[in-house]
């Protein structure tokens, strides 16, 4: 059984969020919270919130044991890009892309044996 949590259109670049997601993929849930709390990246609190939501979904919706959970999938997809312009010299403007992310975390119970 798997429980899933998704944060959509989060205002952080996918490239930066993937750096943090790569640290926690495949580890036990308790260990991941410690890693996220001590990682000085802007994506850490956002990913921690999504992980807490996935654990809560597993506990309340599927009656899974919280101490026996493992992250089976964790990935960041690209969301819609907000296009902005920065004024430049001589009446020109240059584009600024404010990127967003869709963060997905899937937890499942450890296999016995």
Curated annotation (Swiss-Prot):
Q: Which SUPFAM superfamilies match?
A: Ribosomal protein L22
For this record, an example GO cellular component is: cytosolic large ribosomal subunit
The UniProt function text for this chain reads: This protein binds specifically to 23S rRNA; its binding is stimulated by other ribosomal proteins, e.g. L4, L17, and L20. It is important during the early stages of 50S assembly. It makes multiple contacts with different domains of the 23S rRNA in the assembled 50S subunit and ribosome. The globular domain of the protein is located near the polypeptide exit tunnel on the outside of the subunit, while an extended beta-hairpin is found that lines the wall of the exit tunnel in the center of the 70S ribosome.
Q: Which NCBIfam families did the record assign?
A: rplV_bact
| Species lineage | Bacteria, Bacillati, Bacillota, Bacilli, Bacillales
Protein name per Swiss-Prot or TrEMBL: Large ribosomal subunit protein uL22
Q: Which GO terms describe its molecular function?
A: rRNA binding; structural constituent of ribosome
Q: Which family does it belong to?
A: Belongs to the universal ribosomal protein uL22 family.
Q: Would the keyword Ribosomal protein be found if you checked this record's keyword annotation?
A: yes
**UniProt entry keywords in alphabetical sequence:** Ribonucleoprotein, Ribosomal protein, RNA-binding, rRNA-binding
Q: Name one GO biological process term.
A: translation
Assembly and binders:
Part of the 50S ribosomal subunit.
